């Protein structure tokens, strides 16, 4: 599993890459969370 936390501006973004799946979690300064996944 590959996890890359990226801090920039008001957002903290974490991406991970499973076999055939890419996921993204984004958290803003207010604690709102956005999650995205895609299967290739």
UniProtKB/Swiss-Prot annotation:
Cellular component annotations (GO), alphabetically ordered: extracellular region
A molecular-function term among this protein's GO annotations: N4-(beta-N-acetylglucosaminyl)-L-asparaginase activity
Subcellular location: Secreted
Domain of life: Eukaryota
Key words of the record: Autocatalytic cleavage, Glycoprotein, Hydrolase, Protease, Secreted
Reactions catalysed according to its record: N(4)-(beta-N-acetyl-D-glucosaminyl)-L-asparagine + H2O = N-acetyl-beta-D-glucosaminylamine + L-aspartate + H(+)
Entry-linked InterPro entries: Ntn_hydrolases_N
Organ and tissue specificity: Expressed by the venom gland.
PTM section of the record: May be N-glycosylated.
SUPFAM superfamilies in the cross-refs: N-terminal nucleophile aminohydrolases (Ntn hydrolases)
EC number per UniProt: 3.5.1.26
A single GO BP: proteolysis
Active site (record annotation): 21
Keyword Glycoprotein among record annotations: yes
Subunit structure: Heterotetramer of two alpha and two beta chains arranged as a dimer of alpha/beta heterodimers.
Similarity field: Belongs to the Ntn-hydrolase family.
Function per UniProt: Cleaves the GlcNAc-Asn bond which joins oligosaccharides to the peptide of asparagine-linked glycoproteins.
Name of the protein in its database record: N(4)-(beta-N-acetylglucosaminyl)-L-asparaginase
Organism: Asobara tabida
Organism phylogeny: Eukaryota, Metazoa, Ecdysozoa, Arthropoda, Hexapoda
């Amino acid at each position: 599993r590959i996890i890359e936390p990226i801090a920039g501006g008001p957002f903290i973004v974490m991406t991970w890459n499973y076999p055939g799946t890419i996921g993204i979690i984004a958290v803003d300064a207010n604690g709102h969370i956005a999650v995205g996944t895609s299967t290739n």
